[in-house]
Amino acid sequence: MILTAGEGTRLAPLTDDWPKTLFPVGDRPVIAYLFDLLKQYGIKEIVLNLHHLGDLIRENLGDGSRYSVRISYSPEEELLGTGGGVRQASRFWGEEDILVINGDNLLELNIERLILYHQASSAAVTMALKPMGAHSDYTPIYLDQDSNVVAIEGKKRSTPGYAFIGAQVITPAFLKQLPRAGPACLIKDGYRKLLRSRKDPGQIKGFITTGYWREISTFQRYRDANRDFLGGRSPFYFYRWREEFTRRGLHVGKDCRIGPRTNFRAPVYLGDGCEVGAGTTLGSMLLVGARSSIGEACGLQDVIIWPDSKIRKGSHLKEVIVTPFGKIKTG
């Protein structure tokens, strides 16, 4: 299951018009990378919960055939939170354990090892965790010597903590401990409640991974994910243009029209069908989505341009996200 019902309030006003899981990173929506990850491990039956802009998600993803997956939808009349959303959708998998991933995640994760690790324990939940950096602002999670989660706290201890990367395996027995109706949070109403009960220290296991992870819950994190893509630090930049981009720091998609005296400052990515007016300077750190139009005599630096967007003649933009609905200053 991929959690896609949230409102994404920290990314407003972008999320007023477009659901977070469909935000482009590089040349694809975030959720497309999650589909790819799941398919690597033979997982093609996927449930999405829907609430905020759910019709747009359904309209853009359909039955999933474009991504070689099969999507089922669990619409929520009221926003049920992470726990309530999984609880309601559990009719799709019955008494089986379920892998649940946040829909705003970009991650490298060995799902096979995660599942085997979970199955080898008697845990109700197994959380995928990554060692925290010294200046991380994520809520620290602490483990004992047996990799049991012992604390999910808002303050750091002297011992190293871990960040939860938004992927977990959950048992049906755990879901039955959540409130039976209404909104519920997996962490607040589930994991922390289990920890407070102190019945069994092995009820929540931590699976440690060191692979790539970004989530796009804020403007800064969304920009960082796209900078990783442009800078070659992301494992998701390996599609059809990897060799060319690695060599030149420049990708020009199919059917692009580039005006005379255009100046490129790498790294620059132009999606298919883009149009660039004469005398424009592109870059550095510029990502232009497919079918976008940039007028003459523009200067663009550290800009993310969504597909089907338009930049007026003579525009000079820096640290901005441009969408078909408008532009947002992020720096």
Question: Where do the model's predicted regions map?
Answer:
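Conserved N-terminal catalytic core of the sugar/cofactor nucleotidyltransferase
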Residues: 2, 24, 28-102, 108-113, ...
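Catalytic-core segments of class I nucleotidyltransferases/pyrophosphorylases
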Residues: 43, 97-99, 106, 112-119, ...
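Active-site metal-binding loops of divalent metal-dependent hydrolases
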Residues: 7, 104-105, 262
